[in-house]
Amino acid sequence: MTDKPLVVLSKPRYNGDKGYMMNNRICAAFSEGLGGKTVYPEEAGNSIVTYGIRRGSGEAIKRAENFWYIDHGYMKRSDPSGSLNGYFRITKNSLWHSGKGEYPTDRLKKVVSHLEKRRRGRNIILAPPSKYMREFLDLHNWEEKTIEEIKKYSDRPVLISTKENNRMNEVVEDAWAVVTDHSNSAIDALIKGVPIIMTNPARSYGKIEDIENPEFDRIPLLSALSYNQWTLEDMRSGKAWKELKK
């Protein structure tokens, strides 16, 4: 790769927009490690790096031919309200890594100290997309369509888990499986011993038709994801970009 991508900063939606400040702190760290140039969304070109899909970033992604996307990590995620000392995922031309490929387990062991044994609870947990991802990915009827599909293969109760109601950490104890389009809450559930099914083509895992006998070979998936997330210091030092270019 000869040309470095432009790093796209976001613009605040209002005075004191903390999300904007966090986004730009992350992008500035990546730009430092890249040795590249930062621009605002309206100046973004065909090859970009950006954080999230809000504040102009999503529009820049849709216009780009190639993009590197930064967002919350898969495991040991950075707390947006804190010091940003956790992990962030970075992917090329996708919002998530597919989880495919063969990777060592050393980084997984670094971010996950204990994998809980397989749970066999009663409920199927549905984790819908956020309102922002729902709009960006055109997933407006995802819940209805997915529940209809689940009911073809299982008569188990289906609980909808959001950040406001039936939070994942509250319902995972009695879960048989978690079904989501792409939510990282499913990765948390997998670590806690619950099989997962992800329906998004970019990170497809498991099949709804197998929900009564779900896949649970989680080490390959978790190992792959652990190798595709980095810290703020990894970005700033250039380590993240070096590994992404391989």
Residue ranges and their predicted role:
Residues 53-104, 184, 189-191, 196, ...:
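A basic- and aromatic-enriched beta-loop-alpha substructure that forms the phosphate/nucleotide-
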